Amino acid sequence: MPSDFPPGQAGIHARFRVDYPEFSLDVDLRLPGRGVTALFGQSGSGKTTCLRCMAGLAPVSDGYLDINGEVWLDSAARRAVPTHKRALGYVFQEASLFEHLDVLANLRYGMKRVPPALRRVDLEQATGLLGIGHLLARMPAGLSGGERQRVGIARALLTSPRLLLMDEPLAALDVQRKREILPYLERLHDELDIPVIYVSHSPDEVARLADHLVLLEQGRAVASGPLDALLTRLDLPMAMTDDASVVVTGEAAGFDPGYALLTLQLPGGRARLRFVHQAAPAGQRLRVVVHARDVSLALQQPREGSILNVLAVRVLEMAPAANPAHVMVRLDADGTPLLARITRYSRDRLALAPGMQAWAQIKAVSLLA
């Protein structure tokens, strides 16, 4: 089966049909050949099964898998590259380290699979990205859960994979350990040119890490597309959760050292956000997340108040939220999408309707790495 991507354009084509007695997976996905693609869905939706198909660990009734021009599976041609010959890294919920080896020996084990001439990630780069240089002499038994997972990710990177699979790598960690490891995952996103398929049922993780999103329900892909487009679709479940948010990419456009306020120019040209942060070079692209719960609406421009960011918006549509007392409102701020979660009472008091002009008051903005 030929590649479906335009000449010179890399990508991933993953088509799998898997039949179990009580579950079936039937997906046909065309994904970016770089960056992070998140597979999102509830337990039992088929996320891990899809990952196992990519790794060659699940029996596929009919399938095709092309990773940036390298075909690993083609049922029609009776071609199936065995797992140990697929250039992939796999990170599980809990890092499976060799307990009798120190961290350095664990990392070198990952490197042994790759001839020196084919290594795309070296030891210094992997330990630097994951911040584990000071752990090399430690034994796994002396590591925290977050440290173990960072070592496991570094070992996967040292196999110089053409594809990195991550199956809920933060699921086994407590809140503090998740906060510890997320910045390192963001660095991988920014600094490595390896496509990552990231399984999660956490909207917050997806918003922080992903570029592309696939929503799975009962073994079927109900939506697939750029993260920013899918996060604001009110017909999809992610926009209905308590963690509903949007991810906005803008450019650094000024810094006030007296108040440590960074200004971010949004894509539309007129809208800007300000938030407390260190200085950034003018023009540097930055990603921020804005949660729907942190956005309130007013019909008149607020003149006095402590909220820094007040943007002119247009109401696009509304839908009931997961909590029946609330509604979700999709907004446009000069080309920048936003979500607001407000009470039904506020909607009725303001008499909001699609097409209306309003003012969005943004109480918090979180900068992503």
Swiss-Prot record:
Any single Pfam family the record assigns to this protein: ABC_tran
GO cellular component terms, A-Z: plasma membrane
Keyword Cell inner membrane set for record: yes
Name of the featured protein: Molybdenum import ATP-binding protein ModC
InterPro entries: AAA+_ATPase, ABC_transporter-like_ATP-bd, ABC_transporter-like_CS, Mo/tungstate-bd_C_term_dom, ModC_ABC_ATP-bd, Molybdenum_import_ModC, Mop_domain, P-loop_NTPase
Subcellular location(s) per record: Cell inner membrane
Similarity comment: Belongs to the ABC transporter superfamily. Molybdate importer (TC 3.A.1.8) family.
Membrane topology of the entry: Peripheral membrane protein
Chain positions recorded as ATP binding sites: 41-48
Span of domain ABC transporter: 7-243
